[in-house]
Swiss-Prot record:
SUPFAM superfamilies: Class II aaRS and biotin synthetases. Belongs to the class-II aminoacyl-tRNA synthetase family. Gene3D superfamilies: Bira Bifunctional Protein, Domain 2 (3.30.930.10), Class II aaRS and biotin synthetases, domain 2 (1.20.58.180). It comes from the Bacteria. Its EC number is 6.1.1.14. NCBIfam families: glyQ (TIGR00388), PRK09348.1 (NF006827). It comes from Oceanobacillus iheyensis (strain DSM 14371 / CIP 107618 / JCM 11309 / KCTC 3954 / HTE831). This is Glycine--tRNA ligase alpha subunit.
Amino acid sequence: MNIQEMILTLQNHWSEHNCILMQAYDTEKGAGTMSPMTLLRSLGPEPWNVAYVEPSRRPDDGRYGENPNRLYQHHQFQVIMKPSPDNIQELYLESLKKLGINPLEHDIRFVEDNWENPTLGAAGLGWEVWLDGMEITQFTYFQQIGGLEANPVTVELTYGIERLASYIQDKENVFDLEWNNGVTIRDIFYQPEYEHSTYTFKESNTDMLFDLFSMYEQEAKQTMEKGLVFPAYDYVLKCSHTFNLLDAKGVISVTERTGYIARIRNLARSISKIYVSEREKLGFPMLQEKGAK
């Protein structure tokens, strides 16, 4: 099964279980959790079920396309269900079966790994899902998002597409994975992988990036003051990616790093509060729609 078939299989599976199929969010981010389709929509009482593929940029993991297992950009298949269904583990195992992985024939373990994202003020109870000794999914019940209590509890499933494909296709080098009809990850992503690594570690203008961080931070604050949640959150994502570029280049000290993370977290918390307040003013419309049904 190639990657394109894997994605279609997961989309069909979760669509059958009432998930909206969304597209990737069009701003750089380090994880699918950072999409507003997860971070903001997990807040408040309104129900929300969604699934989407998210390209995730981790500048510090860039290796010029030379490492068989580490990538500047990898792909996650993200599933969010709020409130969490009682049979979520069964639904997940069923999705593996549809990918050709029979749980009765493999060693599938849920290894406790409580999750935290300090930058977003987010945390939860969670497990890594290991398939025959390799992590393929992160399974998390959100307890806190944007510094706010998650109520009702949202469950997040994050499949590592490349890791899962490495197992299914029995490949040791991620660049040998087939995306579709003989086209490999190397064909599609090797050049951007090499060039983004070169930019991150050698060519980025650090003075400009420091200035951009401050500009994005200020714009996020000003936009929040206008009550414009989603544009403000876009600038928080830009702050996060800019910080990741600076951090990967090693130009931020340990002390400064803590301060930058706190600045991003404070923005995320403020936006989260405004988002819930704005939805409350609207009468939590998706909650009303569910009640009407």
